[in-house]
Structures are given as C-alpha cells and as structure tokens.
C-alpha cells in the first residue's frame, strides 16, 4: 500500500529568510521523514500590522534563492496570491485541497509561537487538521512551552511535537537593523540572498522597507 504523503509547511514573513529558517526546516524534515518542506511567504499577515512588510515579490524571490539548492524544499505563492489578510487556517485548507485529505501536514513554527497558538483564527479547527511541530529557539523558556503543550493536549487531545534545532541566534529583525546601520550580514543568510538585498537596496530606508 502506498504511503501517505508527509509535507512540512513552514510559514513566515521571511523578511528576509535566513539560516535559522533553513536549519529548522531541514531538522524537522529529517526528524519526521517528510517528503518535502514547503515554504509559504506570508502575503498580508495580520500580526505584522505595526510594521510595513517588504514587498511580497522581494520576499518570495529571496525565499526561492535561499531554498533552490535543496531538492526537498519548495516555495509556494499560496498566501502572497491571496487578497486581504492571510490566516494559517485558510492556508492549511488550501493545501488539503491540493494534496488530498489523507496527506499528513506538519506545520512548523517557532516554539515561542506555541504560547499564542490558541489565539489564532479557528485554532480548534486548525489543531484537528494538521500536526504542529514546535522548534525550540534560543531564549524561550522550556517550562513555559511544555506547560502550553500540555494545556493543548488536555483541551484538544492534540499532540504538538517539540523538536530541538541547532541554536542559531539569528533573526530577520536583526538582519534588517544591521543593513540599515551599515553592518555586515555575511554568514547570517545565504550569499545569494545577501546579494539580492544589496542589488535592490532593501532595508536601507525605514519608510520604504519597514525596518
């Protein structure tokens, strides 16, 4: 009998994408023997309304450049093609339509995001539709994460997996601030992405790039 397809879904603003994202995706892919990981750059994320997000075309192309050398990575335009705010529940429903209801989806998120997952739109439905993988990050208290995971298990009977990934203290915010301040970003992200940022002068001006 043919094995069910196992897909990792990694959503994010990717403004810009960096090695922390890539290391996390590969660690989860290996841990759960996923057929592939699909990166989903956010279109108009409701939680980023306080900061102007870089144009979706730039974020999409940077994600392509960062993932193109890994045959198990793909990039989807499913959210950047959608009008209005983009919510995870809508994205998961779309992937279920595309790949079939039997496909096992593993939504990859930072462990810190688990602390807010019950506030997400249609959280109860979302928790039933896909598996969640919480990747531990530097600076996040393990006890708080475990408490939240236990609470979700009791409420929904849903197991959220926790995966420890190599500790890379890299953030998109720091990269944007470094570029704006004229500081180096080498070795924080793929060289192809660094060249793209330089070519299009991204993150240089607050009013244009939302730094």
UniProtKB/Swiss-Prot annotation:
What reaction does this catalyse? nicotinate beta-D-ribonucleotide + ATP + H(+) = deamido-NAD(+) + diphosphate
In terms of domain of life, where is this protein from? Bacteria
To which pathway does this protein belong? Cofactor biosynthesis; NAD(+) biosynthesis; deamido-NAD(+) from nicotinate D-ribonucleotide: step 1/1
Annotated GO molecular function terms are: ATP binding; nicotinate-nucleotide adenylyltransferase activity
The record ties this protein, via SUPFAM superfamilies, to: Nucleotidylyl transferase (SSF52374)
Keyword entries, A-Z: ATP-binding, NAD, Nucleotide-binding, Nucleotidyltransferase, Pyridine nucleotide biosynthesis, Transferase
An example Pfam family from this entry, by short name, is CTP_transf_like
Give EC number(s), comma-separated: 2.7.7.18
InterPro entries with a match to the protein in the record: Cyt_trans-like, NadD/NMNAT, Rossmann-like_a/b/a_fold
Task: Kindly report, in one word, the top-level EC class recorded for this enzyme.
Answer: transferase
For this entry, list what GO says about its biological process: NAD biosynthetic process
Q: Which family does it belong to?
A: Belongs to the NadD family.
The free-text function statement in the UniProt record for this protein reads: Catalyzes the reversible adenylation of nicotinate mononucleotide (NaMN) to nicotinic acid adenine dinucleotide (NaAD).
What's the protein name? Answer: Probable nicotinate-nucleotide adenylyltransferase
The gene for this chain is: nadD
């Amino acid at each position: 009998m043919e094995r069910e397809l196992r897909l990792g879904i990694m959503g994010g603003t990717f403004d810009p994408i960096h090695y922390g994202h890539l290391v996390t995706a590969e660690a989860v892919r290996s841990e759960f023997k996923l057929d592939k990981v699909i990166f989903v750059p956010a279109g108009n994320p409701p939680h980023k309304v306080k900061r102007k997000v870089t144009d979706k075309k730039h974020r999409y192309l940077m994600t392509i450049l960062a993932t193109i050398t890994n045959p198990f990575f793909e990039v989807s335009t499913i959210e950047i093609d959608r009008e209005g705010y983009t919510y995870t529940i809508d994205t998961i429903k779309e992937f279920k339509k595309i790949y079939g209801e039997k496909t096992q989806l593993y939504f990859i998120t930072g462990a810190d995001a688990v602390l807010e997952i019950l506030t997400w739109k249609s959280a109860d439905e979302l928790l039933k539709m896909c598996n969640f993988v919480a990747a531990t990050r530097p600076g996040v208290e393990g006890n708080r994460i475990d408490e939240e995971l236990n609470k979700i298990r009791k409420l929904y009977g849903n197991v959220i997996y926790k995966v420890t990934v190599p500790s890379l203290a890299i953030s998109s915010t720091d990269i944007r601030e470094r570029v704006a301040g004229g500081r180096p970003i080498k070795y924080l992200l793929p060289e192809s992405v660094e060249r793209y940022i330089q070519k299009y002068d991204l993150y240089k001006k607050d009013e244009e790039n939302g730094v």
